[in-house]
Amino acid sequence: DILNDLDVMQEKKVVQKFLHELVKDKGLASYGEREVRTNLIMGAVDTLLLSEDLTSMRKVFKCPSCGSEEEITVKSQSEADKLEKPCSNCGETLKEESSQTLIEDFVEKAEEMNSAVELISTETEEGMQLLRAFGGVAAILRYHVG
């Protein structure tokens, strides 16, 4: 299928561009959930690369006593169910308020910041490398972040 081949070529190209930036001295590359999220919020991300095989969830927990909120990433719903996290303000156990996949969370933030999003399959060597070596979350930056 020609369209599928074009998608695969585009995916390989964008992952290779990320890897090229990664090895440069002041390269425009960022990876890992926390670092990419920070760069995304700053508006520094040009292209966000996300593995289609990301299964983590982004949850918002709220304190029933003081109303304080915390965002937490969990690997699975069962991990979230077991979470007994105390509120950093008053010590009360936080309750789950809302939930979405990590992919949905990142795509929303990318759209807010006018960053391009590339969902990368694990059908290619580059796609597997993105998932295994970089946790499935990477970015090509608009400018160098010091």
Locations of the language-model features?
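Terminal alpha-helical anchor/extension segments at protein ends
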Residues: 1-146
